[in-house]
Amino acid sequence: MKAVVLAVAVLFLTGSQARHFWQGDEPQTSWDRMKDFAALYVDAIQESGKDCAAQLDASALGKQLNLNLLANWNTLTSTFNNLREQLGSVTKEFWDNLGEDTVWLRQQMNKDLEEVKQKVQSYLDNFQKKVNEEVERYRDKVQPLGKELHKDAQQKLKELQEKLAPLGQDIRQRAREYVDALRTHLGSYTQGMRQGLAKRLEALKESAPVSEYQVKASKHLKTFSEKAKPALEDLRQGLMPVMESLKASFLSSIDQASKQLSAQ
């Protein structure tokens, strides 16, 4: 029975209740907002039905059949509004009684909601606390391992340097021996080249005037210089970016090596 009364109340809310929605003089309760929404919904249905009836009357079929749906709809709406006004006092009393009867229910629901919120907050706090404890425990376990790893790395590096030191010394010694042997082997060739060059210079002096060769040599050098100057300039321009790149790479390598040594 209460469900039937509730349905009737929703359908036959008074117009004054709908207007109260727009006035907003006093803060509305949830029940007032519900009643105003129901009234607006009913008014919207009436307007939509009126527009639909007008469109059907204006159509070719409506004119041919002389439906007059709009007039009938207006009559029905007027009758409906009269009935709603007559039931206005009944619906008002129903909403007031329903609001009073459910005050305790809303209070209990708010209380239960607050208890749930407190329980959930307590659980979240406890969960956060446990997570922090686990993170701290993990950090305590990892920190000695990190120190041990760093210590082992330094020890391994030191051992590697000690092992490589004799090898480097041996390589340097062998390189010196190779250089000395190469110098000794090339000594005889350089001596022979110097002697041959001295003989050719002596023969050159005897076969032609020195001044003539000097003039020819100067001329050839001048011609070579003029021809080689553009090529040398192009070579210099081409080498400049390469040298700058090598310089930047070298400085970057030195910087990285310095950072690694500082970190150790």
UniProtKB/Swiss-Prot annotation:
It comes from the Eukaryota. It is found in: Secreted. Keywords: Cholesterol metabolism, Glycoprotein, HDL, Lipid metabolism, Lipid transport, Lipoprotein, Oxidation, Palmitate, Phosphoprotein, Repeat, Secreted, Signal, Steroid metabolism, Sterol metabolism, Transport. Homodimer. Interacts with APOA1BP and CLU. Component of a sperm activating protein complex (SPAP), consisting of APOA1, an immunoglobulin heavy chain, an immunoglobulin light chain and albumin. Interacts with NDRG1. Interacts with SCGB3A2. Interacts with NAXE and YJEFN3. Pfam families: Apolipoprotein. GO terms for molecular function: amyloid-beta binding; apolipoprotein A-I receptor binding; chemorepellent activity; cholesterol binding; cholesterol transfer activity; enzyme binding; heat shock protein binding; high-density lipoprotein particle binding. Residues 67-264 are annotated as: 10 X approximate tandem repeats. Glycosylated. Palmitoylated. This is Apolipoprotein A-I. One of its GO terms (cellular component) is spherical high-density lipoprotein particle. Belongs to the apolipoprotein A1/A4/E family. The modification Methionine sulfoxide is found at M109, M193, M240. InterPro entries: ApoA_E (IPR000074), Apolipoprotein_A1/A4/E (IPR050163). The keyword Lipoprotein applies. Sequence repeats lie at residues 67-88, 89-110, 111-121, 122-142, 144-165, 166-187, 188-208, 209-229, 230-240, 241-264. Major protein of plasma HDL, also found in chylomicrons. One of its GO terms (biological process) is negative regulation of very-low-density lipoprotein particle remodeling. Transmembrane segments: none annotated. Participates in the reverse transport of cholesterol from tissues to the liver for excretion by promoting cholesterol efflux from tissues and by acting as a cofactor for the lecithin cholesterol acyltransferase (LCAT). As part of the SPAP complex, activates spermatozoa motility. Residues 1-18 form the signal peptide.
